[in-house]
């Protein structure tokens, strides 16, 4: 059974999505996470085999993270794209507690914090540019959460530090 963590169509087809953003904008935040996983060595052997050329372009930064997800992964982040460690981390950090709708993963919260201006107003996640500059804002937060997750014994759900 495949676990789907996110799908750009859930966003682009959802209420409040800016139609002028185009369907690709729903993949940007997904792409930032998957690019981090790939660059951190957590791509699955299947993804490596099926998307060899596309992954080379991602690693060379000739394709943006959101475009990679949109074009190569059909806009989806699924467990089969990640190795075992990447899957466990995505479950804990990206998905959170599936049993409790109020306990979503911390990733989107961190993403909004990373891309928002310092004026206290959160950025509309669908208007964030799909660029490597955006990735450079987001990746350090994912690195920190991965370190936290690892330090805490790789729990099933990652929560804010007490």
Question: What do these predicted ranges mean?
Answer:
Residues 35-38, 116, 143-146:
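Alpha-helical repeat scaffolds in large eukaryotic proteins
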Residues 54-55, 90, 159:
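Short, surface-exposed, charged/polar-biased interaction segments
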Residues 60-137:
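Amphipathic protein-protein interaction modules
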Residues 1-68, 72, 77, 81:
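N-terminal low-complexity, intrinsically disordered segments
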Residues 4-19, 120, 127-154:
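Polar/charged low-complexity regulatory segments
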Residues 1, 154-162:
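N-terminal domain-onset segments
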């Amino acid at each position: 059974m495949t676990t789907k963590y996110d799908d750009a169509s859930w966003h682009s087809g959802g209420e409040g999505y800016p139609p002028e953003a185009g369907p690709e904008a729903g993949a940007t935040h997904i792409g930032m996470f998957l690019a981090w996983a790939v660059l951190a060595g957590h791509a699955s052997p299947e993804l490596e085999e099926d998307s060899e050329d596309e992954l080379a372009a991602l690693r060379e930064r000739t394709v943006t993270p959101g475009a990679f997800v949109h074009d190569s992964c059909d806009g989806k982040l699924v467990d089969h794209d990640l190795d075992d460690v990447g899957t466990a981390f995505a479950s804990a950090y990206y998905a959170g507690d599936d049993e409790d709708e109020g306990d979503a993963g911390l990733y989107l919260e961190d993403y909004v914090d990373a891309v928002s201006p310092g004026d206290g107003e959160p950025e509309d996640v669908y208007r964030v540019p799909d660029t490597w500059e955006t990735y450079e804002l987001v990746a350090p937060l994912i690195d920190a959460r991965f370190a936290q997750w690892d330090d805490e014994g790789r729990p099933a759900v990652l929560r804010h530090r007490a």
